[in-house]
Amino acid sequence: MNLRKFLGGTVLVAFMLFSYSEQNQVNVLCSTDWFMVTVHPFLLNNDVYVHFYEVHLGLGCPPNHVHPHFYQFHYRVTECGIRIKAVSPDVVIYSSEIHYASKGSSTKYVIPVSCAAPRRSPWLTKPYSAKAPSNNMGATPKNDTSYHVFTLPEPSEQPNCSCPPYVYNQKSM
């Protein structure tokens, strides 16, 4: 029984290590406005460390966020020669390349990167009427730039709760 638990634990650890070593070395995110690529320093393999000054996006755009464990390119889709292709009325594909040129040798690589994004942002809602409600609750008084949303209780008023005494600056008895 103990041997079975040991072997099961060993297999689990081996699986976790294998999964960790197979991480994506390049991650791409995009929207209708932004194109973001994250590159890990061991981009090519685990033996070659890629310095941030050896990589660029598209037409020479350097990483604009450099961290010890990743470099990030975050540019508008209209910059760096990023290409745009509409594949349907609802989806657009953005594509570019990560260019690697080693400073210590003549090694060069081009890694294609692409991302699909919806044409319409899921964060934007449909237009709605800006008219105030009929009971005029949302209207502002004349010559006033703000309106009353809620009132805070007076300092002497305390809500009915079982809060600790220090919440209301009272001394405990």
Swiss-Prot record:
Family stated for the protein in its record: Belongs to the PLAC1 family.
Subcellular location, principal: secreted
Function: May play a role in placental development.
Pfam families: ZP-N
GO cellular component: extracellular region
Subcellular location: Secreted
Signal peptide: 1-23
Protein name, per record: Placenta-specific protein 1
GO biological process: placenta development; spongiotrophoblast layer developmental growth
Keywords: Developmental protein, Secreted, Signal
